[in-house]
């Protein structure tokens, strides 16, 4: 704080950026507001023992990456985009129709978060949000997240740092995309 009432931020803790949307969803707290209040000299309005977690939140970091090229960045113009919205859906993003995904920054385009009173409700809400999200012009991590969220391994909580390799998620994604293409072809022929 400078001159009593002017705030200047040089850097905000990156851990807040990564974790705060889902932490806010399960705690009901606004961490950014609390951080600013603390910087303003105000005490926290609660004690640790008062905190209660509620429900389940899932965050998918929507990246401009090509899964089949070892997650290489995908850059360029984004002529059209649809951002999912609705109850218990949050999407923090810079995307808008006509924007450009630059090669000079991190590939993160959006943090898509969902909440539900149960894991299954949060998971199915995330699948709906991923199906509703559309980013034209660049490759994204959206199809991979759909494959992961639909996998029995994910549903059963069999998570690990080698999840993609251990459960052959890239191969499963390839199969899913092939089936999706076949289904679209069959639908077009039937029409």
Please place each PLM-identified region on the residue numbering.
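Catalytic cores of soluble metabolic enzymes centered on carboxylation/carboxyl-transfer
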Residues: 17, 21-191
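A short beta-strand motif that forms the metal-chelation/ATP-contact edge
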Residues: 6-15
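Short, small-residue-biased leader/transition segments that mark boundaries at the very start
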Residues: 1-2
